[in-house]
């Protein structure tokens, strides 16, 4: 199984890099880095934000074709109930910066799209 572990910032990716032998740089430009640390394992620094995350995922899908992409990091969460290194597993994802409530959509729902996106239960 080919796996890509993605984090926005080098600080979020560092614990994974420290665990593996130095990887081969597959691609690096600006804040974006793709490291191959094993034949079927990639560590990816995507850069911050939805646009960078989407571009990174598209590149991964086209060039690397992973079976699984794991996104890790703070993902914008500053909940005081969470501590550094806590593992939080989501059951669904939603936008946090979309407001079409004036058109009778739920907060975070992009018009004509689902209000949220469930996680693959097999994971």
Report residues per predicted region.
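Short, active-site-adjacent cap segments at secondary-structure transitions
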Residues: 12-14, 76-79
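Mid-sequence, gly/pro-rich, charge-dense loop/helix-turn segments that line enzyme active sites
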Residues: 78-123
